[in-house]
UniProtKB/Swiss-Prot annotation:
CDD domains: ZnF_GATA
Pfam families the record matches: GATA
Disruption phenotype: Impairs the repression of siderophore biosynthesis and utilization genes in the presence of abundant iron and thus produces siderophores even under iron-replete conditions.
Domain of life: Eukaryota
PANTHER family to which the protein is assigned, alphabetical: BOX A-BINDING FACTOR-RELATED, TRANSCRIPTION FACTOR GATA FAMILY MEMBER
Coiled coil keyword on record: yes
Zinc finger (GATA-type): 131-155, 287-311
Principal localisation: nucleus
Protein encoded by which gene: SRE1
Role, per record: GATA-type transcription repressor that regulates iron- acquisition genes through specific binding the GATA sequence elements of target promoters. SRE1 targets repressed under iron-replete conditions include genes encoding a number of key iron-regulated factors such as those involved in siderophore biosynthesis NPS6, SIDA2 and ABC6, as well as the high-affinity iron permease FTR1, the catalase CAT1, and the superoxide dismutase SOD1 encoding genes.
UniProt-recorded name of the protein: GATA-type transcription factor SRE1
Amino acid sequence: MAHPSGSGGTSFAPTPTHPHHLSRETSRDELEMAESLRLLNQTHDHQKPRAEATSQEQQQQQQQQQQQQQQQQQQQQQQHAQEDPRSEIYHSLEDAVPIADGPPTPSTAASLQIPNMNYETPNASITGQVCSNCKTTQTPLWRRSPAGETVCNACGLYMKARNQSRPVNLKRNTQTQPTMSVQQSPTPGSTDGSRTCAGNVAGSPRVATYVAADQMAAGTCPGGGRCNGTGGQQGCSGCPAFNNRVSKTAKFALAQANAAPGENRGGSDAASSTSAASASTSAIPACQNCGTTITPLWRRDDAGHIICNACGLYYKLHGTHRPVAMKKQEIKRRKRIVPAADTSSQAPSSVANYSPPQRPSQTPAFEHSVSPDPSTALESREAYTPEPPRGPIAVDFTHYYSNSSVTSNPVALTPTVQPSAPSPRKRSRSATLDPEEPVNPLPHRPNAISAILNPSQTEVDANIDPSLSVPLRTSGGTSPNFTLSPEEKAAKRERLKREAEAMRLELERRQKELEELEND
């Protein structure tokens, strides 16, 4: 326990807890430690009033610098308003960042350290783009919700994948901002001067390259599917390149407005005025590879540098950086609206859109049966009912044992069916033809495909056994017995003889096989 020593210092010698214990002598190390602690306390007590005085002086200097910057900004705005009444152009209703039309102010390249920004403050509306779901003002791509509200890229992708709003607790706390270097035009009076290639600027990863926004006049977009990100046309309000440019410009201006002035407290007045002039100039991001400031989407390469959409896709596809010679001053917007189709483009009909005509109530005569073109016959066949799968011909045995009248005329008993008599069997396509049209096509006509696809009634009936044909019905009485004509009897007799002979030969062959098996 520390207690005052005899020399006036503080001694760290332990105090005896009991009176009967003897106290030991203080060592040399303990005395040196106590002396150094006393000197340190005295030095700290002397520095306290000095630090308070220094802090008051710094606060006064900061207030003076803020007043000077405000006066300089007001003077510059008054000068621009006197020179040109159209000196300030606002890209949107919420955007209050002035972009000058005149030539850029000559200044040297300066670097600006962006401090931490609080996006929940009311000043965040100056960016012009706020997510309606998570209230963020930072996103690589602004999207539209199904309800038409502006949402950030994360909320839009979440809604597209899950069909529900993204929870607010998933929002990342991105309060720290990287260092951004500002490069401004070195030559005064050059409105369309070439941009400084950002690829030649040495910088560490996560360093965004910014260039002066005065290098390209605002409101000079040509329109018509070509975009340079400056606006001025009717369709620029929904252009991603224009919205991205406005958002980045406003974000940089907001960072300058929230930046604590007087970071370099030990600098001279000339250095302070130079930094204030450079800080008042609006800036926009530039591609680290080609130096362009026009892109619908900012990307990052493997090293963490900010690059444009074209350079990012080229690097992703080819594995190398995009050549600077491929850089274009304008980008082509994708046309998402399908133009109206012309009448000439509708002339060729597509096979996928072909719909066959409806079949009429009565099947017409097959007019294309005499056409020598096979394709014509195939097209005409699509209008009829497709044929059933090939197989045994269907025969109706309902009236096989029915009674029929006996007539003395043998010709009337032939199996030929008259056109006027209704056929009890299923009707084929040839039965629906007109009676005036010949059933069999002429032999000299080269329409073999039509004959195969549409067989005649005679060819169909030739495959049926004559004994199974339906007898004709007459107006006379009915006969209890069914008789055949002599020709049919002779044909049946010959058929039975052939079958008997075949059976006899088969029986002899089987008998020989049995004898061979018995002999073995």
